[in-house]
Every structure is written in structure tokens, then in C-alpha cells.
Amino acid sequence: MRILAIETSCDETAAAIVEDGRRALADVISTQIDIHRRWGGVVPELASRNHVVQVMPVVDEALSRAGVGPDGLDAIAVTSGPGLVGALLVGVQAAKALALAWQKPLVRVNHLEGHLVAAFLSETAPAFPYLGLVVSGGHTSLYAAHGFGDYRLLGQTRDDAAGEAFDKGAKLLGLPYPGGVAIDRLAKEGDARAIRFPKAIVKGADLDFSFSGLKTALLHHVKKHGLPEGKGLADLCASYQEAIVRALVEKAFRAARRLQYDRLVLSGGVAANSRLRGAVAERAREYEGMEVFLPAPRLCTDNAAMIAVAGTHAFLRGERAGADLNADPAWRL
């Protein structure tokens, strides 16, 4: 079966056509990085306006690349939450219009579920059950995945998301947007042991995260020592990044050990970070039998192919959305 999916939850306008929930026939993304760079972050109004301009062109491009017309589609899936309400509305309205015009079933998809199942687009897909760590600009959450549509939240950030900590930290250091990419690049030239930052974790046995204190520690460091340049800036980036990565890895493997999971799926935009990917792989080697699934960086950032995977299985479960489908910016998985 073939699903057309539309994703507009934040600042990427995306459309994809996926066959049988495993093979992407087309995966088109129109990025807004250049639009938001001058502001140092995503401006919701600008994001929504650009989605209006780009949503139908990316759908047309996906159909063209896949060599598929409306008659070759079984259903349409769309991200209806969580995310920016104006951005979500553009995708939802486009999907409803196409479903009506083409007389196709419509399925709503939770954006976080899309990230959790993105690994099924890789050559080697995980088997259930597995732990899913979703790390992005708006979310840092740890889930137990028991099957498609069957997830249990184990822990989440109590304040800033990891991606937000990267972006705000980069802005504080005068680095360009997107900040996580800039920090990752500079950190490769730095010493992660140069500066000691506090652990960005919640004390105790729970699996929640907290990054606001780490961000404050970076601010105090810059106020005290000034903004470094050259090797000093690289060391600061590497040390700050290491503190974020250490918290993510520690909590994920604490959950694996406690709940006796031997599969971990890493997803979300921050999962494209080279140090995080390396640290997860390194820690996994310490656990006999532990399998780690790291989707390609393109599948970690927002895309519609992952929405199509989740949409395929929602469709097979008999889920359908009606003409009253609306954006749900706070939709919890």
C-alpha cells in the first residue's frame, strides 16, 4: 500500500510517499533555515506563511518523484500535532483538501510517533519492544515502544528540551542558527574536558531530564570569563555539548538496564549530532546484546516519510480522520 504524508509541524515543509511502511518512493523537504537564520530561531508566523507557499509544491514534487498519481495512493496521512499551531494548520488543511478532492481516507499522525518509527525506513529495522529516545528542539522524551501505536512515556524534560539547550547556548555564544549544528561542528576541534559543567540530569531514580541549569551555567561562565575565540570557543562548545550528551546517554541506558530492554532507537533532530551518535554507540558496546538503531541524519530531522510509516500502521488499525480534523499543538503521545 502507498501513503502520501504531509509534515508541517515546525519549520520544514515536507511530503513523502512510502510503500508498505518501509520503502520511501519519494521524500521531499523544503527547509526554512535561511528564512529564520536572521532571527536566531524559528518565528512561528513566518513559518506558517512559508508553509502556505510551499505545501502544494512539495506534494507535487513527491508525486512526480514517485511516479505516482492520486489513483495510486491508498490514503493520506498528516501531522496534526504536537507543534506550532499555525504551521500544523497549513498541513492539516492541505491534507483534508486533497483527501476530499481525491476521495482518499485521511489519517492523523502524532509527530513524536513519527520520530519513534523513523528507523523503520532504514535497511535494518528494530523489532518491538524497544526504548525510543526522541531528542529535538521542542522535545526530549524517553518511551517504551511495544508496537505501532502502543507507547508508554518513561521520562521527559522538565524544562528545556535538549535541542533548545543547544540552540540557546549557541545564540549566547554568538553562533549562527541552527545552533546545534554550529556547536557540533566547533566541538570537533575542542576538548570536552576543558570546562566542567554540572550534570544536566534530575537527581534521583526517575528518568526525567533537565537542561535549564546547564544553560544557566553556560551564561554564568561567559559572564565571568568573557566570550572566547578560537580554541577556547571550541573547548567551550565541546564541554557544553558533552554535558548535554552525557545526560541523554545516562538516562537512556539507565532505563535499558532497569527495564531490561536490549534495543534502543535514537530519533529527533538532535539525534543527527555526531557526538551523541558516537556516545550512544560507545555505551552500547558495554552492554552485551544491546542493539542501537541510529536512523540516517536525514531521517532524524523533521520529514514526512516517518509520518507515512506511522500513518500506514494507523490506517491498518482502522483509524480514520474526518472533515473536522484540527491541529492539536499539545497532543501528547
Swiss-Prot record:
Substrate binds at V134, V135, S136, G137, G138, D167, G180, D184, N273. It comes from Anaeromyxobacter sp. (strain Fw109-5). NCBIfam families: gcp_kae1 (TIGR00329), T6A_TsaD_YgjD (TIGR03723). Belongs to the KAE1 / TsaD family. It is found in: Cytoplasm. One of its GO terms (cellular component) is cytoplasm. This is tRNA N6-adenosine threonylcarbamoyltransferase. Its EC number is 2.3.1.234. Signal peptide: none annotated. Its cofactor is Fe(2+). One of its GO terms (biological process) is tRNA threonylcarbamoyladenosine modification. Pfam families: TsaD. Its main location: cytoplasm. Binds 1 Fe(2+) ion per subunit. Keywords: Acyltransferase, Cytoplasm, Iron, Metal-binding, Transferase, tRNA processing. The keyword Cytoplasm applies. The keyword Iron applies. PROSITE patterns: GLYCOPROTEASE. It catalyses: L-threonylcarbamoyladenylate + adenosine(37) in tRNA = N(6)-L-threonylcarbamoyladenosine(37) in tRNA + AMP + H(+). Required for the formation of a threonylcarbamoyl group on adenosine at position 37 (t(6)A37) in tRNAs that read codons beginning with adenine. Is involved in the transfer of the threonylcarbamoyl moiety of threonylcarbamoyl-AMP (TC-AMP) to the N6 group of A37, together with TsaE and TsaB. TsaD likely plays a direct catalytic role in this reaction. Fe cation binds at H111, H115, D302. One of its GO terms (molecular function) is N(6)-L-threonylcarbamoyladenine synthase activity. InterPro entries: ATPase_NBD, Gcp-like_dom, KAE1/TsaD, Peptidase_M22_CS, TsaD.
